[in-house]
A protein has these predicted regions:
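Residues within the DNA-recognition helix of helix-turn-helix
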Residues: 49
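Glycine-centered, phosphate/nucleic-acid-interacting loop/turn motifs that mediate DNA/RNA or nucleotide
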Residues: 57
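N-terminal helix-turn-helix DNA-binding core of bacterial DNA-binding proteins
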Residues: 7-45, 67, 73-75
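Basic, amphipathic "hinge/linker" alpha-helix immediately C-terminal to the N-terminal HTH DNA-binding motif
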Residues: 66-87
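Amphipathic alpha-helical dimerization/coiled-coil segments
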Residues: 1-5, 22, 81-100
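Short beta-strand "wing" residues that participate in macromolecule-binding interfaces
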Residues: 61
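Alpha-helical DNA-recognition elements
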Residues: 52
Length: 100
C-alpha cells in the first residue's frame, strides 16, 4: 500500500505557508498588512514564507499605489491552487487511511 504522506506538498507542509495559500485561494487577493494581521505574524516571518511560495510560483505579486502609497497584494496562481487542492486531497487520504 502506498504511503499517503508521500503525496503531501513539501512546500505546503509548513503551517504558515498553508495558511497563506488558504487565505489566497479563498480570496481573490490579499495585501501584505491584511495577511500579517489575519495570521498574526511578524513582517519578516511573513515575507520569508511569501518568498518561498513565490519561488514555487504558487503565488503572484501585484504591486500598485493606493492614495500615492505603495501597496503589495498577493494572489494564488493556478499552479498554487492546484498544489493546494492536491495537498488537501493527500491530507484527506492520510486521515482515511488512519481510520482503518
Amino acid at each position: 500500500m502506498k504511503n499517503p504522506f508521500e503525496n503531501l506538498d513539501k512546500v505546503l507542509e509548513h503551517s504558515l505557508r498553508l495558511q497563506i495559500i488558504s487565505v489566497l485561494v479563498a480570496n481573490d487577493s490579499c495585501d501584505f498588512n491584511t495577511l500579517k494581521e489575519l495570521l498574526n505574524v511578524t513582517d519578516g516571518n511573513l515575507a520569508t514564507h511569501i518568498k518561498a511560495l513565490e519561488r514555487e510560483k504558487y503565488i503572484s505579486v501585484i504591486k500598485s499605489f493606493v492614495d500615492r502609497k505603495p501597496n503589495t497584494r498577493y494572489k494564488a496562481t493556478e499552479r498554487g491552487k492546484h498544489a493546494f487542492k492536491k495537498h488537501l486531497d493527500a491530507m484527506e487520504q492520510v486521515i482515511k487511511q488512519q481510520k482503518r
